[in-house]
Regions:
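Polar/charged, Gly/Pro-rich intrinsically disordered segments
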Residues: 32-46, 55, 62-72, 92-127
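Short catalytic/binding micro-motifs of nucleotide second-messenger systems
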Residues: 85-89
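N-terminal secretory signal peptides
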Residues: 49-50
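C-terminal motif of bacterial Sec signal peptides marking the signal peptidase cleavage site
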Residues: 19-22
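Short amphipathic alpha-helices in soluble, non-transmembrane regions
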Residues: 74-81
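Bacterial N-terminal signal peptides that target proteins for export
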Residues: 2-10
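Transmembrane signal-anchor/signal-peptide helices with a preference for the extracytoplasmic
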Residues: 24-29
Length: 127
């Protein structure tokens, strides 16, 4: 009887461990490649000079604009960047696993910063 209980609890423990570790693992994707493709997309189709990078769990993306945007325009551009990276990563839950730091430069100055932490909404601030 004790041996059966021990075996039962061991099996339950192992199943729980597998389920928990499977749920917390980021999806298999190359986020660095998605960032690179997004960079190319904005340069070629939108004519926006930009640079992107991926470091551990944070995507960093800088856009250099020729005209100064409003806060609303900056927010729209940032959302376009997020959607494009998500599209190229082939995972609609990308932002449940990665943080994002964005900024917009105009005339050699950073004028807007955007941050989006895992599972949170995008926050845009003027500098």
């Amino acid at each position: 009887l004790i041996k059966r209980k021990s075996t039962f609890f061991l099996v339950i423990y192992l199943i729980s461990l597998i389920i928990i570790s499977g749920c917390n693992k980021p999806p298999e994707q190359d986020i660095g490649e998605a960032v690179s493709k997004t960079e190319d997309y904005f340069k070629k189709s939108k004519g926006i000079d930009c640079v992107g990078a991926f470091d551990d769990d944070t995507v960093k993306f800088r856009l250099l604009l020729e005209e100064q945007p409003t806060v609303e325009e900056a927010t729209k551009i940032y959302n376009d960047v997020l959607k494009t990276i998500e599209k190229y990563s082939n995972n609609e839950k990308t932002w449940d696993y990665y943080n994002v730091k964005l900024d917009i430069g105009y005339k050699n100055n950073i004028i807007f910063k955007g941050t989006k932490d895992v599972g949170e909404k995008l926050i845009v601030k003027s500098k």
